[in-house]
Amino acid sequence: MSNARQRELIREFLAVTSATSAAAETYLERNHWSLDHALDDFYTQSGGGGRAEQYSAELVATFERYAAGGAMDTEALVRYVGDLGFQLEDVATLCLARLLKVEELTADISRFQFLSTWHGLGCSSLPDMRAAVDALELRLRTDAAYFRALYAYTFGLGLDAGGRRLSVETAIAYWSLFFLDHTYAVTVPAPRLRSWFEFLRAGDHSVSRDTWDMFPRFAQRFPDDTELLEHYNELASWPLVIDEYYEWVKGRNQL
C-alpha cells in the first residue's frame, strides 16, 4: 500500500474519532490498514458503544441490501449500479465510483466508504443517491475542472491489477464515453478522435498515464490535420506515441 493511501486512511480515521494521528496509525497498522476493522478496534478498546457518526437506519439498510461480510464486492456493486438505474459503461457510473473512492473495479466497497459518503451528502435511499449522481453527471457538462478530475481518475480505474498502462481497447472505450457525443465541458473534434483511434488500432500500442493526460490538450491544440501538419513541433514535450501519430498522419497526407 502506498504512503499516500496510508495517509488518506489516517485522515478518514481521524474524521470520525477523537484519536491522535499516532493512535490512528497504530490502530490501522495492527488491523492491516483495514479502516472498518481499525475503527471497530478503536471503539472496542475505548469502551464506546458506537461510532461518532450516527447513520440513519434507512442508509444502513440500503448498504446491507448489497453487503456481505461488511463490504460490497464486485457482484454486489454491479447489482447496486443497476438498481440505481445505470449501466456499468455509463459516465454516471464513473462519477459514482469516484464519489465512493473506488480505486479499482475489482475492489470491495467498505461499510465506512459507503455510509460516510452518502451520510455526508444527506442521502439514504436509492432515489436520493440516483439524484446525487445525476447531478454529478450534469456537472460534467458545464464544469471543466470537474470533468478533468473525473477524466484523470478514470485512468487508474481502468488499469488491470498491477498494471501501469491501459490497453488500447480500454482506452478507446473510455475516450468514446467522454468525447464521442460532444456533450461535456471538454471536447475533442470528432475527426481527430476517429483518426487517433485508427492509428492506435493499427499499431502495437498501449496507453500510458502521460498519453492519457495529454491527449485532450493535444486534440484541442491541433483540431484538424492542416493545423497539425503546419504547426506541430516534434521537439515539444508531447509523449512519444503522439510524435508517432503525427508521423502517421503526415505519411497518410503524402499519399
UniProtKB/Swiss-Prot annotation:
Residue ranges annotated for the DCUN1 domain, each copy included: 54-250
GO cellular component, one term: ubiquitin ligase complex
Record-linked Pfam families: Cullin_binding (PF03556), UBA_4 (PF14555)
Disulphide-bonded residues: none
Keywords: Ubl conjugation pathway
The protein, known as: Defective in cullin neddylation protein 1
Domain UBA-like stretches: 6-43
UniProt record, GO biological process: protein neddylation
Function according to Swiss-Prot or TrEMBL: May contribute to neddylation of cullin components of SCF-type E3 ubiquitin ligase complexes. Neddylation of cullins play an essential role in the regulation of SCF-type complexes activity.
Listed InterPro entries: DCN-prot, DCN1-like_PONY, PONY_dom, UBA-like_sf
PANTHER family reported in the protein's UniProt record: DCN1-LIKE PROTEIN 3 (PTHR12281:SF31), RP42 RELATED (PTHR12281)
Record flagged with keyword Ubl conjugation: no
GO molecular function, one term: ubiquitin conjugating enzyme binding
Domain of life where this protein originates: Eukaryota
